[in-house]
Amino acid sequence: DDFESLYPDIFRSSNITRCKLQMMRTSPQPERWRLGPTVAAGLTLRHYDSFRNCKSLSAYSNRIAKESPEFDQWGIHVLASQNGAGEILIGDSHEYDWQPSIFDQPIIDKLILNYLKSFLVVPCLEITQRWHGVYAKLPRQSEFVAYPDTEVTIVNGVGGAGMTTAFGLAEETFNQ
């Protein structure tokens, strides 16, 4: 939002949109139960570009589009990870819109949980918290970079891979 306010012309020409995602968190799992590494399943293969060379991805994507179009409608793929308190974080969905709704869609949470149950058994799936986030997304590009002034560099739109790429991109930008 600062980018949009401070440099509206550059922002409008950037093609950045917004992505809203819905997430959930369970109550803590029984004491010694641990999930281990983050768990993902087939829908996640369709979401991240890292998997685009997977030979069966096209056939799988076509099957999902035909049999479960609601996953595409809401941009759903499912990840589950456990925090130090034993809670399972579950998500997420992807609604691309310049003005995403402030209201969450209960059907999205239901679809995510039903899909999660199809490949993961968790002792306690009692959902104690639900939230959504909104981030900047640059379709078909990894980041937007502009230099509106000699002392200003704008880097934005890394949403979707920001937690993975942000530190490397920051280092690259500062070293220029």
Where are these regions (language model features)?
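C-terminal catalytic lobe of FAD-dependent flavoproteins
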Residues: 74-77, 82-89, 95-176
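Flavin-dependent oxidoreductases
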Residues: 1-81
